[in-house]
A protein has these predicted regions:
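Amphipathic alpha-helical "coupling" segments that flank catalytic cores
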Residues: 1-187
């Protein structure tokens, strides 16, 4: 786009065209005739171009879901910023954490969810960690697909937390004296 007009051609190693593509769920080629309708054209095809609009959608959808269940999100601005950049059309969903993992320290649970999976932690009104997590899928709302997406994310989290549980239990089974003895052999 040069001076508000769509420019087609080639410059060095780049080809300039007058088309782009919709969200992967639509998988459609979109012809752009003028810049005035570019953003709306993308939104109509499930690509929210404006980062602030994507962020607002995530925040509003999150508030709606959590208020319904009287829950709170653990505030994590940097994770929100990261997730906003990972999705074109945010779909906020809530999954469940298997009860067996709730015995892990809060820091272990939240780190696994945040760092490895980009999931948000959820608490009750007293800030106790809930056996639920919130995540943002890159898809349109669809009850059947959302159900499968939630199930899939729950399975992935179960595997991650199983690993965390193994390492945590292994670590606490050793005393500091044991660890110090093992460290004597490290150069």
């Amino acid at each position: 786009i040069v001076k508000g007009k769509v420019k087609i051609g080639k410059d060095l190693f780049l080809n300039f065209t007058n088309f782009t593509f919709s969200h992967r769920h639509i998988d459609k080629k979109i012809i752009i005739n003028k810049i005035d309708n570019y953003e709306k054209l993308l939104e109509d095809n499930l690509v929210i171009l404006d980062r602030n609009k994507r962020s607002d959608k995530i925040i509003n959808d999150t508030s709606y879901l959590l208020n319904k269940e009287k829950l709170k999100l653990v505030n994590d601005k940097s994770l929100l910023d990261e997730v906003v950049g990972l999705v074109e059309f945010p779909n906020v969903l809530i999954g469940s954490i298997n009860a067996q993992f709730m015995k892990l320290p809060r820091e272990v649970l939240t780190t696994v969810m945040r760092v490895h999976q980009k999931y948000f932690s959820i608490t009750d009104k007293e800030n106790n960690l809930e056996a639920k997590f919130l995540f943002v899928a890159n898809s349109i709302k669809n009850k059947n697909r959302d159900f499968r997406v939630i199930e899939g994310n729950e399975r992935v989290l179960k595997a991650r937390l199983s690993d965390a549980c193994y390492f945590f239990e292994n670590d606490i089974s050793n005393t500091f004296e044991n660890w110090n003895e093992k460290l004597k052999h490290v150069l």
